[in-house]
Amino acid sequence: MTTILVTGSNKGLGREAVRRLLEHGHDVWLAARDAEAGARIAAELGARFVQLDVTDDASVVAAVATVGRLDVLINNAGIAGSHAEVADLTAADVQAVLDTNVLGVVRVTRAFLPLLLGAESGVIVNVASGLGSQGATHDPSRVESHVVAPAYCSSKSAVVMLTTQYAQALPALRINVVDPGYTATDLNGNQGTQTVTEGTDARGAMALVGLDGPTGTFTDRSGTVPW
């Protein structure tokens, strides 16, 4: 049985990913900062729960000790951050987004790496966005080209590059990054055109690749996403 941990998974895309992975018979840890909400949702779904705040080193280390064994890590936790106009955006606004969306990936990956390297087929799936794609944000035909969100977009671009660097440095693991697509979640006021089920297709597929599977790729449910 594959043991999978999904960060930030007490709602939205993370919750749906947990639900679908459980449906396919996997052993899934629902990880969330909010212990009360996380434990409640985990019980509803039939998942195991671990409290994990991706911005807190001690919380991450404690989660590793609780989990003990892991095959697949899905770095899903993320925030939209401030909606301030660009001229009013502060360094603190950007730092808050980077701390969760980028440094959170680094903290969690570093802490769980020994478990993943000890697995028969260790996998990491990082959740980015088309808003982190140079190609998508410069293509007038795509919705991403009409979004101005410097902190969020730059954070997701960083996640894409982090993924390719991890993939190069850790060839024993399969490490990929996915774009959920424009999905209806609270991050966009539920304005997205995809369902959360559609938004979890790519991460579900990449979570279950074997040793002969791809690594260092950027995909969505339709295929390759432009860098």
Where are these regions (language model features)?
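Catalytic loop of short-chain dehydrogenase/reductase
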Residues: 89-98, 117, 121-168
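Conserved NAD(P)H cofactor-binding loop of Rossmann-fold oxidoreductase domains
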Residues: 77-83
